[in-house]
Amino acid sequence: RSPSRGLGDVYKRQIQMPYGNIGRMKSWGADGNMEFYQQIGKDAHVILRSNFTLSKNKILNWEDTKKPYTYLENNGYANNVQRGFVAMGLFKDQQDVEMSPTQFGTVRPGDIKYRDINGDGKITDDDKVPLFAYSGVPQLMYGIGAEFRYKSWTLNVLFKGTGRNKFLYGGSDGKSFDGYMPFNQKDKGNIMTIAYNPENRWISAEYSGNQATENPNARFPRLYYGKNENNTKPSTFWMGDARYLRLQELSLAYNLKVPALQRILGINSMNIQLMCENLAVWDSVKIFDPEQATSCGQAYPLPARYSLQLYLNF
């Protein structure tokens, strides 16, 4: 939609332009798969498999009202790019607050300190910059699998993972942001115990009796009652890396032939298989499953599953 095409400044504020397919976006990427087979003697073989998908895009033309700074424009950035403030840690003391640009609401020591990108002496939406692209959707996805077979035994393993995938803690859809739990909701959130740990948050020395607790690099800002207008802004302070590598499947199977069963029941062979799913994940999120990053851990976690399966071949 173009809210500006062909309109003067006066009319832009009074007329709602209709939607139109007038933008241009470039999309590109790559995908591929590979399989390797190796026979080992007459009783064993190994199969290695891998695949990947890489997807990127860039807006070439987005008709919009003129922005005061180029980093506020959509042109040249990915579609649905996440914008936010650049955090500089936490305010150290009241002097630090007074010597810094004005921010949001009543700011105190222990609150998040933002960078004044345009240098106008105040923090506003004009200081929001592109933080990351794709808003919770990974640019890179891949899988790695292997099969090892020896006589009647078969071992299968499957890994899957993502790359180039960031998110905001507290963003319910990876884009909107209402604050990091438990700072936005006092009655729920599976990370409340993390914030409760004094080592993870800024605490005034007036209460702790220890100057070291006023840590400007703490994981959490100061605690407060209700909602803090300053600390619930989208920023690099709440940005996380959602890339991961997961051991998705691991199975061990044994193929068995019992002549007596073939004569009596017509069963030519049986395959007994132990299947394990979602066994382990390596990531930097830690406090909840990285595939649930956009839900901020409020969804039911992905369980590990174990099953014993029996297949009959008649």
Show which residues each predicted segment covers.
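Outer-membrane beta-barrel "beta-signal"
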Residues: 31-33, 302-314
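Conserved small-residue
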Residues: 23-26, 30, 37-136, 171-217
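Single conserved hydrophobic/aromatic residue that forms the stacking wall/gate
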Residues: 1-11
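Transmembrane beta-strands of outer-membrane beta-barrel pores
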Residues: 36-38, 52-58, 150-152, 161-165, ...
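Membrane-embedded beta-strand positions of outer-membrane beta-barrel proteins
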Residues: 32, 48-50, 157, 272-274, ...
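Transmembrane beta-barrel architecture of outer-membrane proteins
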Residues: 15-16, 24-30, 52-58, 138-142, ...
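Repeated loop/turn-to-beta-strand initiation elements of outer-membrane beta-barrel proteins
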Residues: 41-42, 152-157, 259-260
